[in-house]
Amino acid sequence: MATSRYEPVAEIGVGAYGTVYKARDPHSGHFVALKSVRVPNGGGAGGGLPISTVREVALLRRLEAFEHPNVVRLMDVCATARTDRETKVTLVFEHVDQDLRTYLDKAPPPGLPVETIKDLMRQFLRGLDFLHANCIVHRDLKPENILVTSGGTVKLADFGLARIYSYQMALTPVVVTLWYRAPEVLLQSTYATPVDMWSVGCIFAEMFRRKPLFCGNSEADQLGKIFDLIGLPPEDDWPRDVSLPRGAFSPRGPRPVQSVVPEMEESGAQLLLEMLTFNPHKRISAFRALQHSYLHKAEGNPE
């Protein structure tokens, strides 16, 4: 099916994954988001899409069968405009008008009510637990790709795209923010699903602060800002396979969470620290975070 079926309405934005367009499906009247990517053709006599891209798209289509409420829907996939070297693949997603960044900016002072934050976090974690249960690491969670519908439903977007888009991203000189990146990513160590839980912690704090928690301007600067809060981790937790040694950072102890998020109650601070745990093997999972008492008790009630 061709993308010409959809009527372009507006350019939504340009990011690491290329240009995103809002379009209308004239058959249903629904709005969709079109994300196009250039993929280098595979080798072999027939050329065509590389098998890795075919597998990634097949996985996204398989997830779609579950219709998880907290994951943005993939409506269609179109391959068009083939040349000898590359194919344009267009992913057609459901369109949601605002992301979490816009949602937070629109909240009147003093910000979101705590119960709203807890509701958003429960939905966020349910969507992420679903992705992790299906062996998908998002790798780029940030407020801009967490969508919030007008009815308050959270939907995760841009998951499963990192490998599909690796070629496009090499062609697109967009600065990717470091602010939500886990220490193991900043150190260029091996990583898996725990990287997403670090990002969740950064976003959790931002829901209260209404500004990012760690704003570094390089990998080393970002790590320094992280250690200013959680303290310099012990030698045993420092990954072995990295070029940046622990000794590059001055010793420092942890600071109380309330020094950066004063509005957060103690059990919320405990949950945040379990997300912002340096060692990924000790970091809380999305499944376990969903069971945490903080997300199941009313504000101000005892444990």
Curated annotation (Swiss-Prot):
- Activity regulation (record text): Both phosphorylation at Thr-172 and binding of a D-type cyclin are necessary for enzymatic activity. Full activation of the cyclin-D-CDK4 complex appears to require other factors such as recruitment of the substrate via a substrate recruitment motif, and/or formation of the CDKN1B ternary complex. Inhibited by INK4 family members. In resting cells, the non-tyrosine-phosphorylated form of CDKN1B prevents phosphorylation at Thr-172 and inactivation, while, in proliferating cells, tyrosine phosphorylation of CDKN1B allows phosphorylation of Thr-172 of CDK4 and subsequent activation.
Q: Where in the cell is it found?
A: Cytoplasm; Nucleus; Nucleus membrane
Keyword tags: Acetylation, ATP-binding, Cell cycle, Cell division, Cytoplasm, Kinase, Membrane, Nucleotide-binding, Nucleus, Phosphoprotein, Proto-oncogene, Serine/threonine-protein kinase, Transferase
Q: How is it modified after translation?
A: Phosphorylation at Thr-172 is required for enzymatic activity. Phosphorylated, in vitro, at this site by CCNH-CDK7, but, in vivo, appears to be phosphorylated by a proline-directed kinase. In the cyclin D-CDK4-CDKN1B complex, this phosphorylation and consequent CDK4 enzyme activity, is dependent on the tyrosine phosphorylation state of CDKN1B. Thus, in proliferating cells, CDK4 within the complex is phosphorylated on Thr-172 in the T-loop. In resting cells, phosphorylation on Thr-172 is prevented by the non-tyrosine-phosphorylated form of CDKN1B.
Q: Where, per the database record, does this protein carry Phosphothreonine?
A: 172
The record's active-site residues are: 140
Identify the Pfam families for this entry. Pkinase (PF00069)
Give the top-level enzyme category.
Answer: transferase
| Coiled-coil residues | none
Q: Where is the Protein kinase domain?
A: 6-295
Q: Which InterPro entries match?
A: CDK (IPR050108), Kinase-like_dom_sf (IPR011009), Prot_kinase_dom (IPR000719), Protein_kinase_ATP_BS (IPR017441), Ser/Thr_kinase_AS (IPR008271)
Family membership: Belongs to the protein kinase superfamily. CMGC Ser/Thr protein kinase family. CDC2/CDKX subfamily.
- Complexes and interactors: Component of the D-CDK4 complex, composed of CDK4 and some D-type G1 cyclin (CCND1, CCND2 or CCND3). Interacts directly in the complex with CCND1, CCND2 or CCND3. Interacts with SEI1 and ZNF655. Forms a ternary complex, cyclin D-CDK4-CDKN1B, involved in modulating CDK4 enzymatic activity. Interacts directly with CDKN1B (phosphorylated on 'Tyr-88' and 'Tyr-89'); the interaction allows assembly of the cyclin D-CDK4 complex, Thr-172 phosphorylation, nuclear translocation and enhances the cyclin D-CDK4 complex activity.
This one is known as: Cyclin-dependent kinase 4
* Taxonomy of the source species: Eukaryota, Metazoa, Chordata, Craniata, Vertebrata
**What is this protein's gene name?**
CDK4
